[in-house]
Design a protein with these regions (language model features):
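Conserved catalytic core of the tyrosine transesterase superfamily
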Residues: 1-239
Length: 239
């Protein structure tokens, strides 16, 4: 595989599949020995997630708010989407799945169903509450009926808004705000990193993001360390 110009991650995944197959074959008596033990496994460099600067995130949110001033349903919806993605660190699929009964505006919290059907309650702040309330009261259409009637985010025809539409809205807002191009998942990364920078502990960030293990959340400490090193090298006279 190494001679076919495949990426390290692809080679690693395929090697893992081969090892898994032969482990099963040996366990069930289909082969006498496991030839995959001789397979090497390349080290895969872990890429750091894309994270907006705090000022960049603020610019993105302010741009979304300013566009929504005209009361356009599309702009109100986009404003609510980016505010919630950044405020809660929700996955785009979790945002799409939100129903009206999952929202508590008074408590400023969302009930989110994450991976493995794990449920969590995530708080959000006043800016996200303002955006969401504006969308629900002034932008969200009232469909005559159908499967999308309880969805928080609806399209013009009353259907549940999809992940692709949310991604397009986020990319559009990033371009208009003249910040780094980001996807919804980058807002999740940004939320986690900014929480840690602000003094939140790893366990809290794990709960907010809905990670099943703390080790998944620890990647954001690497992001913080990388940012720290970058800032140090820029600022210190003897870096």
């Amino acid at each position: 595989m190494a001679g076919r110009s495949l990426s390290r991650s692809t080679v690693a995944r395929r090697g893992a599949a081969v090892r898994s197959f032969y482990a099963w074959a040996e366990r069930t008596g289909r082969v006498g020995t496991d030839p995959s033990v001789r397979l090497g496994s390349p080290k895969v460099a872990r890429s750091l997630p894309t994270v907006l600067a705090v000022t960049g995130a603020a610019t993105l949110m302010e741009t979304a708010r300013e566009l929504a001033v005209d009361g356009s349903p599309a702009d109100l919806r986009a404003w609510a989407c980016v505010e919630l993605l950044y405020a809660t660190g929700a996955r785009v699929g979790e945002l799409v799945s939100l129903d009206l009964q999952d929202v508590d505006l008074d408590a400023r919290s969302l009930r989110v169903i994450g991976k493995g059907d794990r449920e969590r309650v995530v708080p959000f702040g006043v800016p996200a509450a303002d955006a969401l309330r504006s969308w629900l009261e002034d932008g969200r259409p009232t469909p005559a009926g159908g499967s999308g009637t309880t969805a928080v985010f609806l399209g013009q025809r009353g259907q549940r808004w999809g992940q692709r539409q949310i991604r397009e809205a986020v990319h559009r807002l990033a371009a208009l705000a003249a910040v780094d191009d980001v996807a919804p998942h980058d807002l999740r990364h940004s939320a986690a990193t900014h929480l840690l920078h602000g003094g939140s502990d790893l366990r809290t960030v794990q709960e907010v993001l809905g990670h099943s293990t703390l080790s998944t959340t620890q990647r954001y400490t690497h992001v913080s360390a990388e940012r720290l090193r970058s800032s140090y090298q820029l600022a210190h006279p003897r870096a």
